[in-house]
Amino acid sequence: DAVRWHFIGHLQSNKVKYIAGFVHMIHTVDSLKLLQEINKQAAKHQRIIPCLLQLHIAREETKYGLSFEEAAEIINDPKVVGLKNVRIIGLMGMATNTENEIAVQHEFVSLKHFFDRMREQHPELTVLSMGMSGDYKLALSAGSTMVRIGSTIFGERTYPSAT
């Protein structure tokens, strides 16, 4: 129990069964369908899995996530309240991968404002995850409560070259 596995990558519904028995938190819930599947698989293991809704705040189409409107619909959906084996405890967003700090700061601030609005009605939302190794200082200044800094800790990823 000393290690807490956080799932931070894109998660397909058909892969949830492989992590539901041990994952501590899932950071990348980007649909109601995925949330329902996490609930179903967590129930099989008699667990409650904390989740973050992933919001699409970047200007890059390669990133996944919900719009603010879609996230609000899920947070306020009575069906979600009935899901007994998942808990939405916050929001996660990744900013555009750019050197333009003003643009990145704007994306983080807009997510923080949305988080604050949602939290007024849903005080159980306590985690705002934004910021990675390259932009975590901007994220913290905007109000992030959780950062992902694996590259800073472990070094940049190296991929084997194709031969």
Protein language model features and the residues they cover:
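Glycine-rich phosphate-binding active-site loops on the catalytic face of alpha/beta enzymes
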Residues: 30-34, 132, 136-163
